[in-house]
């Protein structure tokens, strides 16, 4: 079997799908994208296709190493996202050829279900509470919320009080009937993170995500030493080498690699194993589409330390398409009691509605994240 063609489809709301075709008619799908930089990743995918056309798709490990090491310059969000989507599609092909789900090819199940959580948008307490109520009706009891709006490098007590007030109202509204993590989104400087985390401790969040930016990772162990709240990070780390430094330094309790950013299934399985050796849990980052989610689920079901799975059903980013709009076998992604079951169909287990993908790709938007500014007009972290 040989790879004959690679096609990319930019799609709403902010996704990109990839299709790999073979000379035997077996097709694999992947999801390579950086939110807001889809065209750049698309260019990287097509540059990498020179290494793939005419090659045997079953040699996943070799093709991964070729894509990573054949260029003198490597790593980073663009290249690793391109590799990630290609890698997902290669695993999809392998599973279809062998008539087995990807998790079966990786040694089989370590669990029968995985807890899902949902992102809840909004900065006003009333909006967040309404969002949680809606999601609870469809079975969720675990959520992730914005931990704060933009903060200055050193900000005033009013800004801290506003963030804490939102969390306090949510805990008061639901008590211990729900669990929620708080996403700082890298918006908070190290000095302000120290202040804000301490003020949030009485409300016992499940975790605090990206308390500071990944490039400030030296602060993770310092912040962790000052709080009992587990710290989470990883969506802006792109290879096992990025994660190695964080694991060695300590401080992170929950690792969040993104299967569409950090080299795909091949790389993230290695990252999961590294995390387990450090007694760090796994909760893959996934605010993206159905192929990315499927890839995450296969890792979850073969990784002992996987504890939570993010998913984007109903997320406020989903303008123009919902999580399962391009999927034919929607029932396979149904949740029971807030848990996902293993995907049982061969490969990734996603049946893509290709005609719909082609139609929606014709006028796909170029999504950009908001550009925020502080009161003094300097650029703020989003």
From Swiss-Prot:
Cofactor dependency: Mg(2+)
Listed EC numbers: 4.2.1.6
Pfam family, one: MR_MLE_C
Enzyme class label: lyase
InterPro entries in UniProt: DgoD-like, Enolase-like_C_sf, Enolase-like_N, Enolase_C-like, Galactonate_deHydtase, Mandel_Rmase/mucon_lact_enz_CS, Mandelate_racemase_C, Mandelate_racemase_N_dom
Superkingdom as given in the UniProt entry: Bacteria
Residues given in the record as Mg(2+) binding sites: 183, 209, 235
Annotated site, Increases basicity of active site His, chain positions: 258
UniProt keyword annotations, A-Z: Lyase, Magnesium, Metal-binding
CDD domains, sorted: D-galactonate_dehydratase (cd03325)
Any Gene Ontology biological process: D-galactonate catabolic process
GO molecular-function terms, A-Z: galactonate dehydratase activity; magnesium ion binding
Active-site feature positions: 185, 285
Chemical reaction(s) catalysed: D-galactonate = 2-dehydro-3-deoxy-D-galactonate + H2O
Note: Reaction proceeds via an anti dehydration.
Purpose: Catalyzes the dehydration of D-galactonate to 2-keto-3-deoxy-D-galactonate.
Family: Belongs to the mandelate racemase/muconate lactonizing enzyme family. GalD subfamily.
Name of the protein this chain belongs to: D-galactonate dehydratase
Lineage summary: Bacteria, Pseudomonadati, Pseudomonadota, Gammaproteobacteria, Enterobacterales
């Amino acid at each position: 079997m040989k790879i004959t063609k690679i096609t990319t489809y930019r799609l709403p709301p902010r996704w990109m799908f990839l299709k790999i075709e073979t000379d035997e008619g077996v097709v694999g799908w992947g999801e390579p994208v950086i939110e807001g930089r889809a065209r750049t990743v698309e260019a990287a995918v097509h540059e990498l296709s020179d290494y793939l056309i005419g090659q045997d798709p079953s040699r996943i490990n070799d093709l991964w190493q070729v894509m990573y090491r054949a260029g003198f310059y490597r790593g980073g969000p663009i290249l690793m996202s391109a590799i990630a989507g290609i890698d997902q599609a290669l695993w999809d092909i392998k599973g279809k050829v062998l008539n087995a789900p990807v998790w079966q090819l990786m040694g089989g199940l370590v669990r029968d279900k995985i807890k899902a959580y949902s992102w809840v948008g909004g900065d006003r307490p009333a909006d967040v509470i309404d969002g949680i109520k809606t999601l609870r009706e469809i079975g969720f009891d675990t959520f992730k919320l914005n931990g704060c709006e933009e903060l200055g490098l050193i900000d005033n007590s009013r800004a801290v009080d506003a963030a804490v007030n939102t969390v306090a109202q949510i805990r008061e509204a639901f008590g211990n009937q729900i669990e929620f993590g708080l996403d700082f989104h890298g918006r908070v400087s190290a000095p302000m993170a120290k202040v804000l985390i301490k003020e949030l401790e009485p409300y016992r969040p499940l975790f605090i995500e990206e308390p500071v930016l990944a490039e400030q990772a030296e602060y993770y162990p310092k912040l962790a030493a000052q709080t009992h709240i587990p710290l989470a990070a990883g969506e802006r780390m792109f290879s096992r080498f990025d994660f190695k430094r964080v694991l060695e330094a300590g401080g992170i309790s929950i690792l969040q690699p993104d299967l569409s950013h950090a080299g795909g299934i091949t790389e993230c399985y290695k990252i999961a194993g590294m995390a387990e050796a450090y007694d760090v849990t796994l909760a893959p980052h996934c605010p993206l589409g159905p192929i990315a989610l499927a890839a995450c689920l296969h890792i979850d079901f073969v990784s002992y330390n996987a504890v939570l799975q993010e998913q984007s059903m109903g997320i406020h980013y989903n303008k123009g398409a919902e999580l399962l709009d391009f999927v034919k076998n929607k029932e396979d992604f149904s949740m029971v009691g807030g848990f996902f079951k293993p995907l049982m169909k061969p490969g990734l287990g996603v049946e893509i509605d290709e005609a719909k993908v082609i139609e929606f790709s014709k006028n796909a938007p170029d999504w950009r994240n908001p550009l925020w500014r502080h009161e003094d007009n300097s650029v703020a972290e989003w």
